[in-house]
């Protein structure tokens, strides 16, 4: 059965945790493992942070949009901004590549997303924005605790 959620918020760093928790609460209906839930929360944090810091250059007037569709045990997550866009997506997806070397932890966002999700697609157009499509299958059988 299909279920979906849509969320929009100002591109402010304090909204990153709101996005992460909201998506996690929605995905919880699939009864994911703690690892699966942590991975989804981490990916949301990375994608939203990229939109805020890189897409909008910390301009709080920008809007970040998130859509989550759950269907047949698969989470389809979309994070979209209408910011500056990415001129070279392939380069941006390289580990440790960053346009902001002065920031701690820079350059690992896409690498983290690729490690935690089953599929990551990035579409971007300069001066129009970026959309990140993420997909994760949630395991159907859970380990039993004795």
Swiss-Prot record:
Keywords: ATP-binding, Kinase, Nucleotide-binding, Serine/threonine-protein kinase, Sporulation, Transferase
Stored SMART domains: HATPase_c (SM00387)
Recorded GO MF terms: ATP binding; protein serine kinase activity; protein serine/threonine kinase activity; sigma factor antagonist activity
One GO term of the biological process aspect: negative regulation of sporulation resulting in formation of a cellular spore
Domain of life assignment: Bacteria
Gene3D superfamilies registered for this protein in UniProt: Histidine kinase-like ATPase, C-terminal domain
Pfam families for this protein: HATPase_c_2 (PF13581)
EC identifiers of the protein: 2.7.11.1
CDD domains given in the database record: HATPase_SpoIIAB-like
Catalyzed chemical reaction(s): L-seryl-[protein] + ATP = O-phospho-L-seryl-[protein] + ADP + H(+); L-threonyl-[protein] + ATP = O-phospho-L-threonyl-[protein] + ADP + H(+)
SUPFAM superfamilies reported for this sequence: ATPase domain of HSP90 chaperone/DNA topoisomerase II/histidine kinase (SSF55874)
InterPro entries, A to Z: Anti-sigma-factor_SerPK (IPR050267), Anti-sigma_F (IPR010194), HATPase_C_sf (IPR036890)
Transmembrane portions of the chain: none
Role according to the record: Binds to sigma F and blocks its ability to form an RNA polymerase holoenzyme (E-sigma F). Phosphorylates SpoIIAA on a serine residue. This phosphorylation may enable SpoIIAA to act as an anti-anti-sigma factor that counteracts SpoIIAB and thus releases sigma F from inhibition.
Family note: Belongs to the anti-sigma-factor family.
PANTHER family: ANTI-SIGMA-F FACTOR RSBW, ANTI-SIGMA-F FACTOR RSBW-RELATED
Protein name: Anti-sigma F factor
Species annotation: Geobacillus kaustophilus (strain HTA426)
Gene transcribed to yield this protein: spoIIAB
